[in-house]
């Protein structure tokens, strides 16, 4: 007989938009839900839409002083509050106070953080913990509901790459990334896809809270291996761009020897190594400053045990 994991019901949920102020789908949806929350209301749930970086939203820029989605580590969250701190660090402390504290029993049960990418990644769910039965079950439910539209899962669990995301203050952090969409732009198709992902996620939580038992399941995920920079010259300037064969090919297998970059003089730089990888965030506009042309991932399968709420 398969064991069933009993988990506490979900009570407090936040939906974050505007963590990056120029990623407009989340901004648009959260602003709408703040005016009229009927769509995200579920019986027995406290669902709070929230604009995380209002100053960046006002200026339609990714951030004011630094990336809000990278400062939710305990060092930044524990710094003494001061006007000298970067705006986003001060804002992180405010958000941690409202929805955390991080790693505490009082923290919100679940945070959805809504993002857009200029990369051709379609609907993407971002997972931070490969052993989380509840989120694997939720992602399986969302993927099934979104079919036949693909919904990929990006696993950012890595021993040396620490993200310190805004959503990491919650017990269950969920990143939702939908593209391609230029920053500072709204596209109806992307808006519709993100809206449906949130609907299905909230439906799953409601079913779970009402006592539905979810049988064992498994999902394919793409786990981060490393980030790849653009080729650079002696001055540190970019010396090549993403090759046309790689452009828009997120989630597709990339084999050793396949073209990855091409320089202005036509030199093609292939993928090295000896294993097939799956590229994501290919040519993401916001990652030029981070010196990231794309991320290599490996494809694997995660399994979750059967789950049900402890109330039933």
Swiss-Prot record:
CDD domains: M14_ASPA. Zn(2+) binds at residues 20, 23, 115. N-acetyl-L-aspartate binds at residues 62, 69-70, 163, 167, 287. One of its GO terms (molecular function) is identical protein binding. Binds 1 zinc ion per subunit. Its cofactor is Zn(2+). SUPFAM superfamilies: Zn-dependent exopeptidases. GO terms for biological process: acetate metabolic process; aspartate metabolic process. One of its GO terms (cellular component) is nucleus. It comes from the Eukaryota. It catalyses: an N-acyl-L-aspartate + H2O = a carboxylate + L-aspartate; N-acetyl-L-aspartate + H2O = L-aspartate + acetate. The active site is at 177 (proton donor/acceptor). Keywords: Cytoplasm, Hydrolase, Metal-binding, Nucleus, Zinc. It is found in: Cytoplasm; Nucleus. Homodimer. HAMAP family: Aspartoacylase. Belongs to the AspA/AstE family. Aspartoacylase subfamily. This is Aspartoacylase. It comes from Mus musculus (Mouse). The lineage of its organism: Eukaryota, Metazoa, Chordata, Craniata, Vertebrata.
